[in-house]
UniProtKB/Swiss-Prot annotation:
Belongs to the exonuclease superfamily. TREX family. PANTHER family: THREE PRIME REPAIR EXONUCLEASE 1, 2 (PTHR13058), THREE PRIME REPAIR EXONUCLEASE 2 (PTHR13058:SF24). It is an enzyme of class 3 (hydrolase). It catalyses: Exonucleolytic cleavage in the 3'- to 5'-direction to yield nucleoside 5'-phosphates. It comes from Mus musculus (Mouse). Mg(2+) 2 binds at D14. The gene is Trex2. This is Three prime repair exonuclease 2. It is found in: Nucleus.
Length: 236
């Protein structure tokens, strides 16, 4: 198996959606932070020595009104509802969203590595479903990194698989608290979770960059979460 291409830009991604995978969810919010590799290799710190987000950073956050209703739990966790999104005049995941995403990604130096926490089980398959419904694609050399198995794998290597390591929680909130002794802000908003994810990545940047270089998965190998119904064309 050949190694993935060395990514020059890392695009940190989070989705908020209408429910869990078994509910055939639809995306209601997406947020992306694009960071050049050089900014991850040389993290910035404030006067107190605390990690801060890179100064050169592209952001994109979009809300959209899905056709499927939110589960009660998803609405409670995300603070989003079909009613609030409709009231604010938000369309669904359509051709305009795809063109915006593609334009955002085209501004970044490639190859691009998409980064999400639990991405292989949720964010990447769901994004793949929405894109497939519209017949849309990402750049062919795009790769993906899921920080959940990556951080577990790195810790397992350091601890030699001890029982204590197996009891650790790897939720975003638990990782952030473990690394920074604080609670993350704006949890379960897409942008808030991407902010948290990027700081977690910066805390382990050398190891995670090396992991990505060796084990990132090609976007072409991501399977959709479910077979989407026929939707509107990209002209929508």
């Amino acid at each position: 198996m050949s190694e993935p291409p060395r990514a020059e830009t890392f695009v940190f991604l989070d989705l908020e959606a209408t429910g869990l995978p078994n509910m055939d969810p639809e995306i209601a919010e997406i947020s992306l932070f694009a960071v050049h590799r050089s900014s991850l290799e040389n993290p910035e710190r404030d006067d107190s020595g605390s990690l801060v987000l890179p100064r050169v950073l592209d952001k994109l956050t979009l809300c959209m009104c899905p056709e499927r209703p939110f589960t009660a739990k998803a609405s409670e966790i995300t603070g989003l509802s079909s009613e609030s999104l409709m009231h604010c005049g938000k369309a669904g995941f359509n051709g305009a969203v795809v063109r915006t995403l593609q334009g955002f990604l085209s501004r970044q130096e490639g190859p691009i590595c998409l980064v999400a926490h639990n991405g292989f089980d949720y964010d990447f398959p769901l994004l793949c479903t929405e894109l497939q419904r519209l017949g849309a694609h990402l750049p062919q050399d795009t790769v993906c990194l899921d920080t959940l198995p990556a951080l577990r794998g790195l810790d397992r290597a350091h601890s030699h698989g001890t029982r204590a390591q197996g009891r650790k929680s790897y939720s975003l909130a638990s990782l952030f608290h473990r690394y920074f002794q604080a609670e993350p802000s704006a949890a379960h908003s897409a942008e808030g979770d991407v902010h948290t994810l990027l700081l977690i990545f910066l805390h382990r940047a050398p190891e995670l960059l090396a992991w990505a270089d060796e084990q990132a998965r090609s976007w072409a190998h991501i399977e959709p979460m479910y077979v989407p119904p026929d939707g509107p064309s990209l002209e929508a």
